[in-house]
């Protein structure tokens, strides 16, 4: 016998025996849930078990996507590129809420590969994601604003059977719970919390020059069934991180190849609530409210161990700390409403979005700084093999608050052997004061 539980994946292996009987027809369905059936053939959907057991992923949700059609991943980072676009050009939703910062250590300062790589480590613990729907292009009119790909992640919502986990290793500790909430009879909960200090790992493998990255991830989701037609979902994510690289890490660098002194601190949070309501015989109306916050400060300096004799104590090595400071603060509050129903043509979908974004960015250079790594287009005197950053040319400040909104509608026409989906989307960007109408 097989026990089937709501919102829980149960792997099952079945072997067919050879028999002499003749059967007229056998229908085999590969899976109960697939990617957008009206999207392009390159769309892909990975369930919880496939994400958890993906070869080479190391239980990292983002690395498990490697190998999907149209997706390019170097393997060194937990992010990806599509059609030559950068990792930050991808449109990412978590439980239908816009949340593009789903990886840790997406550096603003430091080595060039770290700045452009898009992050090293997913904020989601193994087994946290119930499904990942990926589309490299041609997605529904419900989505827009980015030119890369669309990735929709669904956080596990718990189940009627309680289960708990504990994992302890040299990097840190991870705990998890999935099951009834214990507060309300019709409420299930999913909770994970972990804290890792990778500095201990790098010290063990004698790679101290990397630095000391630390992270914490806390994810809580509850699903409450009010009645047969109404469901309330709550999602909370808190994922702070810290990264430091001091003079001891510089001294561990082979031949002092990297002399950067870096301090980075980031607070990342998302809170959202969704109300799903069945309307009539085939309609579904979903409303979502969310608040997300990201506050990141990055500071870079430089050490000069090559200016003193070998073996000089770390405290006596000349350094220039806090040369460059970059602040990135962004908060957003938004509302999303979607409605879908079946009609005589097929499926009709429509929705609206409204969100207010508050950004506060600044760059401050304490004093002139000679840099020997630069772009070929950076201005400098003829023959000079370095550039000099000066506060007057570097210091900047951008602080704005704007409201944006969008609306869409689309109709799917279903025929015997083919389908057609046509839609229209309107976007209004408050920062650029630009309006776009996009037929799909």
What is each of the regions a protein language model found here?
Residues 165, 170-195, 208-243, 263-285, ...:
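Transmembrane beta-barrel wall of Gram-negative outer-membrane proteins
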């Amino acid at each position: 016998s097989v026990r089937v539980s709501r919102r829980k994946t149960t792997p099952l292996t079945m072997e067919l025996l050879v028999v002499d009987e003749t059967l007229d027809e056998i229908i085999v369905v590969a899976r109960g849930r697939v990617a957008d059936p009206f999207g392009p053939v390159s769309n892909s959907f990975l369930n919880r078990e496939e994400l958890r057991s993906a070869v080479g992923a190391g239980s990292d949700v983002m690395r498990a996507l490697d190998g999907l059609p149209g997706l390019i991943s170097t393997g060194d980072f937990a992010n990806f590129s599509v059609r030559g676009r950068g990792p930050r050009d991808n449109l990412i939703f978590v439980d239908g809420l816009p949340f593009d910062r789903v990886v840790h250590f997406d550096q603003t300062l430091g080595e060039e590969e770290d700045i452009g790589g898009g992050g090293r480590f997913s904020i989601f613990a193994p087994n946290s994601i119930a499904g990942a729907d990926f589309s490299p292009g041609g997605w529904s009119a419900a989505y827009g604003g980015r030119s890369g790909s669309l990735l929709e992640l669904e956080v596990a919502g718990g189940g009627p059977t309680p289960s708990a986990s504990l994992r302890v290793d040299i990097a840190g500790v991870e705990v998890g719970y999935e099951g009834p909430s214990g507060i309300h009879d019709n409420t299930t909960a999913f909770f994970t919390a972990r804290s890792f200090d990778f500095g201990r790992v790098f010290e063990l493998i004698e790679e101290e020059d990397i630095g000391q990255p630390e992270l914490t991830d806390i994810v809580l989701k509850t699903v409450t069934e009010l009645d047969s037609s109404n469901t309330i979902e709550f999602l909370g994510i808190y994922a702070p991180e810290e990264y430091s690289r001091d003079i001891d890490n510089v001294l561990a660098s082979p031949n002092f190849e990297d002399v950067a002194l870096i301090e980075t601190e980031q607070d990342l949070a998302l809170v959202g609530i969704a109300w799903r309501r069945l309307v009539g015989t085939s309609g579904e109306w979903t409303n979502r409210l969310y608040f997300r916050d990201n506050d990141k400060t990055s500071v870079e300096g430089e050490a000069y161990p090559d200016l003193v004799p070998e073996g000089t104590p770390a405290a006596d090595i000349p350094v220039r700390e806090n040369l460059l400071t970059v602040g990135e603060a962004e908060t957003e509050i938004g509302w999303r409403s979607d409605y879908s129903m079946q009609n005589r043509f097929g499926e009709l979908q429509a929705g609206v979005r409204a969100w207010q974004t508050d950004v506060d960015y600044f760059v401050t250079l304490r004093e002139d700084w000679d840099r020997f790594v630069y772009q070929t287009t950076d201005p400098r005197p003829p023959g000079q093999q370095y550039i000099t950053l000066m506060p007057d040319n570097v210091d900047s400040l951008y602080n704005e608050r704007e409201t944006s909104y969008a609306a869409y509608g689309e109709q799917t026409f279903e025929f015997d052997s083919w389908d057609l989906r046509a839609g229209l989307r309107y976007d209004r960007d408050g920062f650029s004061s630009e309006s776009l109408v996009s037929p799909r």
